[in-house]
Swiss-Prot record:
Regulation of its function: Inhibited by hydralazine and menadione. Not inhibited by BOF-4272 or allopurinol, xanthine dehydrogenase potent inhibitors. In contrast to guinea pig, human and rat, isovanillin is not an inhibitor but a substrate for AOX1 in rabbit.
Name the record gives this protein: Aldehyde oxidase 1
Annotated compartments: Cytoplasm
Annotated binding of [2Fe-2S] cluster 2, by residue: 114, 117, 149, 151
Species assigned in the record: Oryctolagus cuniculus (Rabbit)
Family indicated by similarity: Belongs to the xanthine dehydrogenase family.
Cofactor: how and how many bound: Binds 2 [2Fe-2S] clusters per subunit.
Length: 1334
């Protein structure tokens, strides 16, 4: 085989020809680094987040059709693109040409915040529209199922793209003739108050129409190439790897014969992650290209034969067509496969992964192989020696040599037989998330009865996720042959299968008892569903099923359907150009949607730029015995390796060590940094650094271990109000309890990133970073380099999400990179991979709350004694502040007359946990709400009644003796009760629960009072700089960081109001310590407030200075006023400053005025749970908030919704797993699940109270970004109510030990029944668990 001279494909309509191709190159770095198309983003590198989505188009010479489909560029080898047309976000529209409607609508519907995920969203939707110009809502949800967003909560994205759907209208409540945006209470429109107008969040008449004729045409050259059907195998050779692309079946078999160990790669979704994450290397890869025999679709009298080269998306489409055409009795297996194909991965992976690759990979959690195994499927395999058939059975799945493919064979096709009359095939799965998540357990089950007799003739049951491969319960099934289909058979089957499909207590993946329960819960579902079918076919054969059991037959599907948004009215007397109070689009929204928004790693490489990669500790607590750098230093491209020894006394900054010196304190601690010419060279060399460790004791991982070892960061914090001990003596009842709450990964879409550029003179250094705290980077870099701070400047254009995770961690990276940059006089770039980021950086603090409550029988809590413990990790970071804020906010909406709360930050051997949105309140508030809920249960009262009876009075005092006016708390609560129709729906929920046994619903309403402030005047100061240029344009700079919350947009709104000029006249370049020095970190939802007051101050200074000129020419323009000022030597620049609110707290006295104001609200959520699987769906959520006067309702609603969904994830599905050795397992989207589009409430309603009072804040506004996280616990408590209802129906005590998150595992195991009692349980201490709680 001769090497191919060139690789030819198209990108955005432009021809690309590569003559020297490295087969190890993926499309993503090629687009970004080679073609400089940086709109396609790196999010995870494993196909799990969708940030790198592009569209690929190929011409099929057989069908004469062009296929458009989305793929993950991070997993797409560039060698696989021969003859393809690639379309990126830049190729469909731009601000300099024309916007595509897909780009325009997501921006105008306020569907972008940080914007990092937006290009991927845009391309997924674009690919859908190329195939379905008027998609259905189901197709829309399916298309976006592989795209993650951490900011928006998805609602505005769906609303934007619903406008393309067949059923799309801006509302779905048209019976009364009113738009959903104008719905009032009970569907009646609200009466507008005089002198007020309601601004629309978006305007439908402004949409650009979708015009398919304006799309990029498929390159004719590629059609001609495809029609010619080239016969020559293409071979691309790199330094380490050879890529072979046969174009005929004969050539493929020849290649496989020559290189029998080479994997056959179609979509690279299995081999690719193995190479990237497991270090598996393949010197030769065989990748067939458009071989017709591998794409066959053949119908025979016995069934359907599908080519192994078909993508899973194609298989899904084929099966959907087949089930419409063949009789239902013949389509059982096809329907079951379709069910799993709808949730398997995301659309991008399904379009890349092939049927054959999925089968051959034999992953233990494969969704299709259990079904194919029970369906009596056959594999047709080929080699040069000929063709043969292999049964897809247990032996094949367990890789028995005699039942497997030989090394020189390839899988050509799969035969899937028709099912028969009296034969039933069903599919089951349960995952942490409904879509785009690997199954915890899945199953395929098939039964065949004798003609009309109800006797089992054949039975096949397979499970995935419960062993090293797919497990077939062959022996159990054999013993059940000849049995009647009844409950006695079911009971026997459960016991047989539990014996045969045994899981050791230390099984990988953990959740052992849950998996055991799912094994037989699925079997029971199979029994019920088959019984129901038999009831329809032959009523006499079916065992009797109670009506209340029928709900078990339906899976939970909660597709988002609609929302209502009730923001505030704008005073009609407001100047028309005054944008304050209007839903102004995020000013980077369009740039987000076109890929033109520049993030740090989008910046072009600096001349002679170096790359930095870290070596991290694999031990939780160990002594560094020796470090051998010689082999790593000898590798090509390696320039240097930085260790703690090089940094000397600059290695410690405050409490943080930049690099480990003699001892490591956690897995993931930075030990040294490799500096090399390229990213690949740096990462390869990092693997060759040899470090010898000696383990040390103790290794403390959990809060309980820290308490036992008295391992705390000092000091203890304490607040006390009243006399707790005396109050306990006079109460009616006392209860004690505790709750453990797991941590949370920030999962910002843009990973930690830094670029340090030495300026070449005076030791000046420019640092570009994705950070919330540029001043801290400036200070740390200056300290490490022993320079005055004025030599170091830190610049931030925008940040692709942060949530508190980019306050301190980026500073360590920047300081080490700066040391190397300074030493070598060359720029140094460092971009963490997703797994590195999650391993190194820490997240939200896990919490343990212990409480003792004394209360009266009417629910009034008289005394409360609470202890808070947080898992701080191995260094202090912000752990003390998190404990302090948790204590100051722990009482939430309630006045406890006697309160004592104490808090400790635990020192453990985990990566240091840090700031996270909410800053202690999501944990502290949950502890209090759990206590309230338990009190209600003890009193026999409803939780909402006990909550209301303990509310703050209108004028009251907090435990730290700050005065409070809680009028809006009560108003939010009452409005939420009314708007959610709480009491009516509670009756409906009770009725539903009485009529259903295996499905239960829960309804919960939670209030909140979120204090806003930083507890210090110094932390609240802010500054700004405003320039007016002679053409009348304005440049504004301030100290806040744009990380998705829209602070730059709000600052321009402030300038527009104050200077009475259009927003289009105002520009903001970014944030820099060069223009605004000595800034505080951006966080705590105070960024717009504090910096806005500084901007306002600067504008007022300018206006005062220019007052004589403006008075002299009141009808003039800013251009005229600026020129006149210049002529009179009047400065057109002004700094603005805000000193911070008067806030303080004296911890010794336990009193002070730490907060400027309070944000009030309430959230009501309704859920439905599946008691057999632990699955849940959120049916509806209503949120009412007091936001003061909203500066920008669109941005503020986005903050509320995004925070709520993030909080919902925190309390339900986001789960971190650590090994007993302290190793974090959850290092990417495949292991750690944040909410996806499938998880949001089916109905979401957000209401802002009208502004009710003037305040000292910016235009009487309130910060909202943090408070909304806690509202997610309304879903948590709704799940609790549903579980309690299930337990009561089973005669169990309703209260049960709560912990967060309430995952499917915890929900299922709390719904105790005969199946949970049937499973074997391992004695604690008899095995080493796979994971441990921390």
């Amino acid at each position: 085989m001769e090497p191919a001279p060139e690789l030819l494909f198209y990108v955005n309509g432009r021809k690309v020809v590569e003559k020297q191709v490295d087969p190890e190159t993926m499309l993503l770095p090629y687009l970004r680094k080679k073609l400089r198309l940086t709109g396609t983003k790196y999010g995870c590198g494993g196909g799990g987040c969708g940030a790198c989505t592009v569209m690929i188009s190929r011409y099929n010479r057989v069908t004469k059709k062009i296929r458009h489909y989305p793929v993950n560029a991070c997993l797409t080898p560039i060698c696989s693109l021969y003859g393809a047309a690639v379309t990126t976000v830049e190729g469909i529209g731009s601000t300099t040409t024309r916007l595509h409607p897909v780009q325009e609508r997501i921006a105008k519907f306020h569907g972008t915040q940080c914007g990092f995920c937006t290009p991927g969203m845009v391309m997924s939707m674009y690919a859908l529209l190329r195939n379905h110009p008027e998609p259905t809502l189901d197709q829309l949800a399916d298309a976006l199922g592989g795209n993650l967003c951490r900011c928006t909560g998805y609602r505005p994205i769906i609303e934007a793209y619903k406008t393309f759907c067949k059923t799309s209208d801006c509302c779905q409540n048209k019976e009364n003739g009113f738009c959903c945006l104008d719905q009032g209470i009970n569907g009646l429109p609200e009466v507008e108050e005089e002198n007020q107008t309601r601004p629309n969040l978006f305007s439908e008449e402004e949409y650009l129409p979708l015009d398919p004729t304006q799309e990029l045409i498929f390159p004719p050259e590629l059609m001609t190439m495809a029609e010619k059907q080239p016969q020559r195998t293409r071979v691309f050779s790199g330094e380490r790897m050879m890529w072979i692309s046969p174009v005929t079946l004969k050539a493929l078999l020849e290649a496989k014969s020559t290189y029998p160990q080479a994997p056959v790669v179609m979509g690279n979704t299995s081999v690719g992650p193995g190479v990237k994450f497991k270090g598996i290397f393949h010197p030769v890869i065989i990748s067939p290209d458009s071989i017709e025999e591998l794409n066959v679709v053949s119908h025979t009298h016995s069934g359907l034969t599908l080519g192994a080269g078909l993508s899973l998306a194609q298989v899904k489409d084929i099966l959907a067509d087949v089930v419409q055409k063949v009789p239902e009795e013949n389509a059982q297996t096809y329907r079951a496969l379709l069910k799993h194909l709808g949730t398997l991965a995301g659309s991008q992976i399904r379009n890349m992964a092939s049927l054959g690759g999925h089968i051959i990979s034999r992953h233990l959690d494969s969704d299709l192989n259990p079904l194919l195994a029970v369906g009596n499927c056959t594999l047709n395999v080929l080699s040069k020696e000929g063709e043969r058939q292999i049964p897809l059975d247990e032996q094949f799945l367990s890789r028995c040599p005699e039942a497997d493919l030989k090394p020189q064979e390839i899988l050509a096709s799969v035969h899937i037989p028709y099912s028969r009359k009296w034969e039933f095939v069903l599919a089951f799965r349960q995952a942490q998330r409904k879509q785009n998540a690997l199954a915890i357990v899945n199953s395929g089950m098939r039964v065949f009865f004798g003609e009309g007799d109800g006797i089992i003739r054949e039975l096949a049951i397979s499970y995935g996720g419960v062993g090293p491969t797919i497990i077939c319960a062959k022996n159990s099934c054999q013993k059940l042959i000849g049995r009647s289909w009844n409950e006695e058979m079911l009971d026997t089957a459960c016991r047989l299968i539990l014996d045969e499909v045994s899981l050791p207590g230390s099984a990988p993946g953990g959740k052992v008892e849950f998996k055991r329960t799912l094994i037989i819960s699925f079997l029971f579902k199979f029994y019920l569903e088959v019984s129901q079918i038999l009831k329809r076919m032959a009523p006499g054969l079916s065992p009797h099923l109670a009506d209340k059991y029928e709900s078990a037959l339906q899976d939970l599907h909660a597709r988002y359907s609609w929302s209502t948004l009730k923001d505030q009215d704008v005073d009609a007397r407001q100047l028309s150009q005054d944008p304050i109070g209007h839903p102004v689009m995020h000013l980077s929204g369009v740039k987000h949607a076109t890929g033109e928004a520049i993030y740090l790693d989008d910046m072009p490489a600096v001349d002679q730029e170096l790359f930095m990669a870290f070596v991290t500790s694999p031990r939780a607590h160990a002594k560094i015995v020796s470090t051998d750098l010689l082999e790593a230093l000898s590798l090509p491209g390696v320039v240097d390796i930085v260790t703690a020894e090089h940094l000397q006394d600059g290695n410690t900054f405050y409490t943080e060590k930049l690099l480990a010196a003699d001892e490591v304190l956690c897995v993931g601690q930075l030990v040294c940094a490799v500096i090399a010419e390229s990213e690949v060279q740096a990462k390869q060399a990092a693997k060759q650094v040899k470090i010898v460790y000696e383990d040390l004791e103790p290794v403390i991982l959990s809060i309980e271990e820290a308490i036992e070892q008295k391992s705390f960061f000092e000091p203890e914090r304490k607040l006390e109000y009243g006399n707790v001990d005396e109050a306990f003596k006079v109460v009616d009842q006392i209860l004690e309890g505790e709750i453990h709450m797991g941590g949370q990964e920030h999962f910002y879409m843009e990973t930690q990133s830094v670029l340090v550029v030495p300026k070449g003179e005076d030791q000046e250094m420019d640092v570009y970073a994705s950070t919330q705290f540029p001043k801290y980077i400036q200070d740390m870099v200056a300290a490490v380099l022993k320079l005055p701070v004025n030599k170091v400047m830190c610049h931030v254009k925008r940040v692709g999400g942060a949530f508190g995770g980019k306050v301190f961690k980026a500073s360590i990276m920047a300081a080490i990179a700066a040391f190397a940059a300074n030493k070598h006089g060359r720029a140094v770039r460092c971009i963490l991979e997703r797994g590195e980021d999650m391993l190194i950086t820490g997240g939200r603090h896990p919490y343990l709350g212990k409480y003792k409550a004394g209360f009266m029988n009417d629910g009034r809590i008289v005394a409360l004694d609470v202890e808070h413990y947080s898992n701080g990790g191995c260094s202090l970071d912000e752990s003390l502040l998190v404990i302090e804020m948790g204590l100051l906010k722990m009482e939430n909406a309630y006045k406890f007359p006697n309160l004592r709360c104490r808090g400790w930050a635990c020192r453990t051997n985990l990566p240091s946990n840090t700031a996270f949105r909410g800053f202690g309140f999501p944990q502290a508030g949950l502890i209090t709400e759990c206590c309230i809920t338990e009190v209600a249960a003890k009193c026999g009262l409803s939780p909402e009644k006990v909550r209301a009876i303990n509310f703050y009075k209108e004028i009251d005092q907090t435990p730290y003796k700050q005065e409070i006016n809680a009028k809006n708390l009560t108003q939010c609560w009452n409005e939420c009760l009314a708007k959610s129709s709480y009491f009516q729906r509670k009756v409906a929920v009770e009725k539903f629960n009485a009529e259903n046994y295996w499905k239960q619903r829960g309804l919960a309403i939670i209030p909140f009072k979120y204090p806003r402030g930083l507890g210090s005047v110094a932390y609240g100061q802010a500054a700004a700089l405003v320039h007016v240029y002679l053409d009348g344009s304005v440049l504004v700079t301030h100290g806040g960081i744009e990380m998705g919350q829209g602070v730059h947009t709000k600052m321009i709104q402030v300038v527009s109001r104050e200077l009475k000029m259009p927003m289009s006249n105002v520009h903001l370049r970014g944030t820099s310590t060069e223009t605004v020095p000595n800034t505080n970190a951006s966080g705590g939802s105070v960024v717009a407030d504090l910096n806005g007051l500084a901007v306002k101050d600067a504008c007022q200074t300018l206006l005062k200075r220019l007052e004589p000129i403006i008075n002299k020419n009141p009808q003039g323009t800013w251009k005229e006023w600026a020129q006149a000022a210049f002529d009179k030597s009047i400065s057109l620049s002004a700094t603005g400053y805000f000193r911070g609110y008067d806030s303080n707290i004296d911890w010794d006295k336990g009193e002070g005025h730490p907060f400027e104001y309070f944000v009030y609200g309430a959230a009501c959520s309704e859920v439905e749970i599946d008691c057999l699987t632990g699955d849940h769906k959120t049916i509806r959520t209503d949120i009412v908030m007091d936001v003061g006067y909203s500066i920008n309702p669109a941005l503020d609603i986005g903050q509320v919704e995004g925070a709520f969904i993030q909080g919902m994830g925190l309390y339900t599905i986001e789960e971190l797993h650590y090994s007993p050795q302290g190793i974090l397992y959850s290092r990417g989207p495949n292991q750690y699940k944040i909410p996806a589009i499938c998880d949001i409430p089916a109905e979401l309603n957000v209401t802002f109270l009208p502004p009710s009072e003037k305040s000292n804040t910016l235009y009487s506004s309130k910060g909202l970004g943090e408070s909304g996280v806690f509202m997610g616990c309304s879903v948590f408590f709704a799940i609790r109510e549903a579980v309690c209802a299930a337990r009561q129906a089973r005669g169990l005590s309703a209260p049960w030990k709560l912990s967060s998150p309430l995952t499917p595992e915890k929900i299922r195991m709390a719904c105790e029944d005969k199946f949970t009692k049937m499973i074997p349980r391992d004695k604690p201490g008899s095995y080493v668990p796979w994971n441990v709680p921390v």
